[in-house]
Amino acid sequence: MATTEYADATTAEDVERGIEGLRRRHPVESAVDEVLSRKRRRRGHDVHNSRSLEEIGKGLNAFLARRLDDPFRVRDLARMPGGASKEQFSFELEWTDQGATRHDQMVLRMNPPASVVETHRVREFQLLRAFDGIVPVPFAYWATQDDAELGEPAMICGLSRGVAAPTKGERTASGIGTVYGPELRTKLAPQFVGHLAAIHTLDPSTVALDAFQVPAVGTTQGVDWQLGRWDRAWEEDSFEPHPTVTLTRQWLWDNRPAIDRISVVHGDYRNGNFLFDEDTSEITAILDWELGYLGDRHHDLAYAMLGAWGHLDDAGRFVCSGIVDAETFIADYERLSGLAVDPERLRYYTVLNMYWAVTACSATGARIAEDRMTHLDVMMNFMGGLGASLIPELNRAITEGA
């Protein structure tokens, strides 16, 4: 059973009481509350039923007709492989933009009834728009959080060219443990670090991010919202308590660092979440902004350095995200960003990242698979094992130096 007293509620009144209880115990940003509450209301009622391309196309045409004044045509609509949370479809749009006829390759990203992480399409849209021209990102065309438009919240963005992993190498699930090789690493590393520095040094007040709440500098507000998010997910989705998770949650609350500078946090910055051109070795797109928020830059740094994403090189050094060794990563980041990296904050966010990964993989993934609310049942079973593998690392991390 899940740990919340309302996890198995069946009446609408019980569900709403449960949501109110979760809100009181675990305050989060309003947009995050919106998507978490939406998932809870649908549990036990909605299951994932794969819709035909004809149905998707009908909804897509109606969606575009509400936004485009001139005639348009959708061509070559197809399901896309990959991804660990959203359904994706590629298509070509023939349309008129500012008087010129265009033929653009686009991607429709749609929520299933529930995901391993619940995220807000308008937030993702705003981040892509904010970083257009600053780092390589797909262009964001339109987004909606209204189920009535396409059946689920959705976003349409440009189709970026490139590959997530070398085509001659072994493909891995969601990019985990991607191996690029020494020559390619040398070319990718400066870009990987440089783009992260550019993300963190953008002043959030200069771009349109009204779907985000801004934490106050000198407080723990930003990390409080993150802990609230993952505590709420664990309480709602886990099947039984786990002593390591209980200890980790307490450690995280007891050791919260106050934020010294507000940065845009990508939230999922690692190998597998960017594309590159195999001929030029140029990073062509940074993807998967859905977990982005305004907070502490150390969150992204610690995440890119997690053991699950990297491997040892021939000299026995750990290669962060399969791209760059930790010492070079930190030194180059500090040089390019002008921002200091605090080892204690890095340790804290390493623990937080492992905690949310355990929650998403071992609790939410298993829960939505059981509830038949995802199109990725097999992937959710795989991710449960990944979450379990992080438990010993969490034990070591919270007892280190204690």
Language model regions located:
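ATP-binding pocket architecture of kinase catalytic cores
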Residues: 75-247, 251, 256-261, 278-280
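Juxta-kinase regulatory segment immediately upstream of eukaryotic protein kinase catalytic domains
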Residues: 6-73
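Conserved protein kinase catalytic-loop anchor
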Residues: 262-264, 284
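Catalytic-loop of the protein kinase fold
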Residues: 264-266, 271
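Hydrophobic residue at the +6 position relative to the catalytic HRD Asp in the kinase catalytic loop
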Residues: 274-276
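Activation of the activation-loop gatekeeper triad in protein kinase-fold domains
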Residues: 287-292
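Active-site activation/catalytic loop segments of kinase-like enzymes and analogous catalytic loops
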Residues: 299-338, 352-371
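All-alpha amphipathic helical-bundle segments outside canonical DNA-binding/catalytic cores
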Residues: 340-352
